[in-house]
Regions:
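Intrinsically disordered, low-complexity boundary segments flanking structured domains
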Residues: 65-70, 144-145, 242-244
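Internal, well-ordered alpha/beta segment that forms a basic, Gly-enriched binding/recognition surface
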Residues: 97, 103-188
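Structured loops at beta-to-helix junctions and adjacent beta-edge loops in soluble globular domains
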Residues: 69-72, 118-120, 158-167, 249-251, ...
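Generic signature of intrinsically disordered, low-complexity, basic-rich segments
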Residues: 17-21, 64, 147, 156, ...
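C-terminal, charged low-complexity interaction regions
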Residues: 7-8, 18-20, 28, 183-387
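An N-terminal structural lobe/cap that precedes and organizes the functional/catalytic core
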Residues: 5, 10-20, 25-140
Length: 387
């Protein structure tokens, strides 16, 4: 499949299922599968093939078990997993730098971890992190060439792991540092829907379970070429929980994904992508990520994402139902809120020769501002001041 445009790749839709070749089933001896009372599926060694929603919430969402296998820290050794992979922290010198949490407070990247056992952490490193770390060193061209040959599943799972870890971490972080405002955690304050994370958790564990993933179980996924600009920024990460969307930039390559749209929000975003004729800036990248989230929350219907089992054959597959890609009436006030949140650390830094900082922020809140196109609808290719 050819890229949608020379600087972007778009996920294809086709038959499945597909799996990540190297899985935790490195010992390929078949194991008898059974279903537990809570609806989970386990093999005869007790390994969890599928976490029921009840078990996921109890052990992973609200518990302290390994987020991959569900083992308790009282039973096996843990060394925990960095939310942002350690090789990214090393490559971009982020260990002693801080990220901004949804509550506006900061946390150092090297302390931003989630519970993970030693075995699963090692497996994830071998199967996911090390290959993708090596691949991304080659930048956009190498990543795009690899995707053309191998497809998107490995990259999609990797980005999904980042999103999952980020929001599992939110269940442990206080929403308010001022105790007078209560002791709720960020996940409680923002009313996280564990069902959404449960589906993603099931999918991204495929490297450890051998689960087959049909392409209709995947959402929108884009690889974007990013140009260097005056900001000097080479790493960027952000996500929007309720729209199940995420963006990650590593040098000149960036990834944008939406996990629950069945690819339909991406179909509408393609109308803008077709007008982009070069690499994007860091600001334009954030707008694209926001636009994907905005379109996703305006889809008329979302696919049902489900697991299918054959316990006798020890097979687990994930599929998504087909829904017609349709949008409800677009509410640009929602776009304004999303844009304001995504750009909250950039106000005062992005300049326009026509408006003051305050006027431009007001335009962003209004939901109609764009960094992608000029007044004539042409793509803005350089770092000239915004019109």
């Amino acid at each position: 499949m050819k890229p949608v445009c020379p600087n972007m790749s778009w996920s294809s839709r086709g038959p499945g299922p597909y799996g990540i070749a190297a899985t935790a089933t490195e010992n390929s001896e078949p194991r008898m599968w059974t279903r537990t009372e809570d609806g989970s599926v386990v093999d005869d060694t007790g390994k969890v093939i599928y976490f029921s929603l009840e078990r996921f919430v109890r052990d992973i969402g609200l518990g302290d078990c390994c987020f991959i296998c569900g083992a308790s820290p009282s039973d096996v050794p843990f060394n925990n997993e960095h939310v942002i992979p350690e090789w990214i922290l090393r490559r971009f010198g982020l260990f002693d730098r801080s990220l901004t949490l949804p509550n506006g407070t900061s946390m150092r990247y090297d302390r931003y971890t989630v519970p993970c056992c030693v075995v699963c952490n090692g497996l994830m490193g071998r199967v996911i992190e090390q290959p993708i770390g090596a691949l991304t060193e080659g930048g956009y061209d190498a990543v795009n060439a690899w995707r053309e040959q191998h497809g998107i599943l490995n990259l999609y799972v990797w980005i999904g792991l980042l999103f999952l870890k980020t929001h599992l971490k939110d269940r442990t972080l206080r929403a308010h540092l001022d105790a007078r405002k209560g002791h709720a955690r960020i996940a409680e304050e923002l009313q996280y829907d564990w069902g959404g994370l449960h589906y993603l958790h099931t999918l991204v564990r495929c490297f450890a379970t051998g689960t087959g993933i049909h392409t209709d179980a995947l959402g929108s996924f884009f690889i974007v070429k990013v140009r260097g600009d005056a900001s000097g920024q080479v790493f960027d990460y952000g996500d929007l929980y309720h729209s199940q969307s995420v963006m990650l930039r590593l040098g000149d390559v960036a990834f944008i994904a939406c996990f629950n749209d069945g690819g339909n929000a991406g179909l509408f975003l393609k109308q803008k992508l077709d007008r982009i004729t070069g690499a994007v800036s860091d600001v334009q990248l954030r707008e694209l990520a926001t636009e994907l989230a905005f379109l996703n929350v305006h889809l008329k219907d979302h696919p049902k994402l489900q697991s299918y089992f054959d316990l006798e054959l020890e097979r687990h597959e994930m599929r998504g139902s087909f829904v017609m890609p349709e949008l409800v009436d677009l509410d640009y006030a929602i776009r304004g809120k999303l844009m304001h949140y995504v750009f909250r650390d950039m106000f005062g830094k992005v300049k326009s020769y026509r408006w003051t900082d305050q006027e431009f922020e007001a335009m962003v809140v209004g939901g109609r501002a764009t960094f992608l196109f000029d007044d004539h609808g042409a793509f803005i290719k350089d770092d000239a001041p915004l019109p």
